[in-house]
């Protein structure tokens, strides 16, 4: 059975998608690469398809009773695609700020063990990350904030696992994110799920040092690292000639938020 890499895009052009698209093709990944698009130029669609990316326009006939921002709406469209297409492993990532340095399927086969999903740590707790901490409070209020503000943060932009579990995770993320007091709630919703049953039992909570995915918004951003570093739960990534490694020298499979590190972004842009 085939594997899948899936992402979503709205109003992104090829220049914003090329690093994601080209980098996965630069690995040994042999599964389907699908981009669900809400709005996209004909020229960009053509270029994506020329690079082996399957472009899936959103199904505008779906009636899901929601007027949500695109970063929440994306989950129902990915759920709809997964409901109608069967795979073994499914990898879902952001697309504008993600690249692949190795085939992510290799990591899943070697490390997922008896778990069904993998989530990627941001290497910091909510109480030490002001944006996330405020977002959690604004999305769910004081009671829920008090329950979770000491928890480790996991990033919703780099998740993966077995098909049926990722499919249903997409549905639950959508359902739990709609009708909230603020529009940006997907990250807070995801973290509450990852820290509660049944999700916490079936999910491998991957540290940055496990090499699955680095989250450079907290572990690499030079404008924030001085503030975050005393509170980080593990060592920070290392850069070598435009590649990103764990502190022990293992090449990351996925690099997320590389655009937060200007020198690294310049090298990645030049490569792809």
For every predicted segment, state its role.
Residues 9-13, 123-125, 259-261:
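Short polar catalytic/cofactor-binding loops
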Residues 1-73, 77-88, 164:
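N-terminal anchoring/stem segment of glycosyltransferases
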